[in-house]
Amino acid sequence: MAQEPIAVDETLIESVVRTFYGRVRKDHLLGPIFEEHIRDWEPHLQNMFAFWSSVMLHTNRYNGRPMPKHVVLPIDSAHFDQWLDIFKKTVEELCVKEDAELFMKKATQIAHSLELGLAFNNKVLLQPGERYIRNKDHTL
């Protein structure tokens, strides 16, 4: 049976998203990338509220396609690791332990999927357990 959130609601999701992206914008690795690609932050945040509402509460509020937005970014495994680190600190600070773990389980799955999608889009063949590193010669 799938684990269900204990204390996650729309208010908590908004708090997680706003806190997380506030930290991302200040991050030395991620901040410049986000600032270059997002001009108006509020629509992006609203989209992320809908995304995480769909992920955590099964609301079906999000109907976007995240892969096309990410394949154009100059990111690789180091960026996903940093993203996950900031996300983990955020949910551990704002959520009860079980919900933080569930958020992280979902976030890790999403990051892994996006990383594999980036590799595939860039014609990179990863071996089992290998991570995507931009400009490393694994082309198909």
Annotate the PLM regions.
Residues 1-140:
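Core of compact, soluble alpha-helical bundle domains
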